[in-house]
């Protein structure tokens, strides 16, 4: 089956409470993990999204896989292990208590990845929670190489504020994120990412540092606006429902590939940022 987007990350059982976890007696079970959430959003738009992750061969792992499949996510690349359990995270009142050390998700190593699933994929996406020091971080490096060899767009969504509770030290998180920024073709950034990485929410202070390595396109999500930059042009739009999943879905529908990124013009960026939820086609070439 052709997959337009492939995400690498973790899937965990998220037990959510209305109050702080230590104060509650009832939790609501949810599917957690950035990659799982992104794939579900992409599938809801009508796109094909596959999740590359490892779960425990336990009831929790099987339940999460069934939920993802029910939501339209391609689960053919999920793997299961008897050696580690499915991770569990307790959340509530802006608090996250992760139990993921020595669990299946972080134990996914590069030796378990093959190049074949990356062929024909339009984009490979990853975030920061899974870059913690573990076999999974090494798997990210191999996946990036495989995606680049296959000609897929490499997209990094740092989401540092959301990833911070899942790292032992915030400084290590930021240092690792800086090491991965220039490995991506496309960055989806938030103001909190800039604050943690560069000490400022102002993008202009960081643009020079960001446009290095493979980076050709940056989407910057502010409180009320979204900005898009290539190395030569920019566009902006009022922020509404233009999630990274929607923007990437539009890129896939427009047929934008890695080789097209340096040539994108302002009108194409404007279509990608459009408030019109039905905007998925670009007339003519994308540049």
Where are these regions (language model features)?
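Glycine-rich phosphate/adenosyl-contacting loop at the front of the ribokinase-like
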Residues: 1-73, 265-273, 277, 281-287
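Conserved phosphate-donor
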Residues: 186-196, 206-236
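Conserved beta-alpha-beta core of the PfkB/ribokinase-like small-molecule kinase fold
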Residues: 123, 128-204
């Amino acid at each position: 089956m052709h997959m337009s987007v492939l995400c690498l990350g973790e899937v965990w059982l998220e037990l959510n409470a209305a109050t702080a976890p230590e104060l509650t007696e009832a939790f609501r079970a949810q599917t957690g993990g950035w990659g799982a959430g992104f794939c579900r959003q992409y599938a809801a738009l009508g796109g094909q999204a596959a999740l590359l992750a490892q779960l425990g061969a336990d009831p929790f792992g099987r339940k999460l896989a069934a939920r993802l499949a029910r939501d339209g996510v391609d689960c053919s690349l999920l793997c299961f292990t008897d050696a580690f359990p499915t991770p569990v995270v307790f959340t509530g009142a802006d608090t996250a208590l992760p139990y993921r050390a020595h669990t299946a998700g972080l134990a996914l190593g590069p030796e378990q990845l093959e190049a074949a699933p990356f062929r024909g994929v339009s984009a490979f996406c990853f975030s920061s929670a899974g870059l913690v020091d573990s076999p999974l971080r090494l798997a990210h490096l191999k996946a990036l190489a495989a995606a680049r060899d296959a000609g897929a767009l490499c997209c990094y969504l740092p989401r540092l504020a959301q990833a911070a509770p899942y790292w032992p030290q915030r400084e290590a998180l930021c240092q690792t994120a800086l090491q991965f920024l220039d490995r991506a073709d496309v960055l989806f950034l938030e103001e909190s990412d800039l604050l943690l990485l560069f000490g400022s929410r102002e993008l202009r202070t960081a643009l020079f540092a960001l446009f290095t390595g493979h980076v050709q396109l940056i989407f910057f999500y502010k409180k009320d606006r979204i900005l898009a930059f290539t190395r030569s042009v920019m566009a902006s739009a009022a922020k509404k429902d233009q999630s990274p999943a929607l923007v990437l879905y539009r890129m896939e529908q427009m047929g934008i590939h890695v080789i097209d990124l340096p040539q994108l013009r302002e009108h194409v960026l404007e279509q990608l940022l459009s408030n019109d939820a039905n905007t998925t086609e670009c007339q003519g070439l994308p540049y």
